[in-house]
Amino acid sequence: SLPWQHASVTGGRWSGNDTPRVFELRGKTLGIVGLGSIGKKVARLAQAFGMTVTYYDIRRLSEDREDALGVRFRLLDEMFEAADVVTLHVPLNESTHHLINADRLARMQASSILVNTSRGPVVDETALTEALTARRLFAAGLDVFNDEPPAPDNALFALDNVVLTPHLAGPTYESHEARIRNGFDNVQRVARGEAPLWVIPELG
């Protein structure tokens, strides 16, 4: 909603009294695809906003661990049918390429939102564009694309129910410094004959 409202103000139109185009996170269900380190952090943040958190991962946690994190496992298709917001946090490989396809998008509620900050080809971009265009999906937030940078004529650019950013969801001043430190630490580990940490899955 922020980009829309910003454009409204700078365009000379005051839309403060319009019918709201947003919903609260409190009481909604979040579906996390990929409960790695990032997925777990997202779960904690979502719980702070009062969301119910479900997840799908190829390796299910123990029930004790699920209880500690406050999350519940769901099969992927079940999650897509029930979640108000689905967020993706998986690496790109043969099993995740187009994991989110036309069939799974069709399972989502028309009021739901898809967020992808993992890798572009995890989502069938053509199928997503069609779902958004037909309003079978309320909105999407994409930080990644099938081709980066996307072509100027990408059909997503013409839609008003999608927010697009140039693969920068992670970088901050602090994270940039941490990446430099981690890279230096990895070089030292390898020089000592130890296994590196923070290996990129696609390159591992």
Where are the predicted features?
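Rossmann-like adenosine-cofactor binding region
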Residues: 58-155
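C-terminal helix-to-coil terminal segments
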Residues: 5-8, 15-16, 21, 147-204
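Residues at the starts of beta-strands that form the adenosine-phosphate
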Residues: 48-52
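Gly/Ala-rich phosphate-binding loop of Rossmann-like dinucleotide-binding domains
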Residues: 43, 47, 132-133
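Glycine-rich NAD(P)-binding loop of Rossmann-like domains
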Residues: 5-41
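Short, glycine-/small-residue-rich phosphate/pyrophosphate-handling segment
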Residues: 1-8, 136, 142
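Short, flexible hinge/linker loops that cap or flank conserved catalytic cores
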Residues: 22-26, 47, 106-107, 156
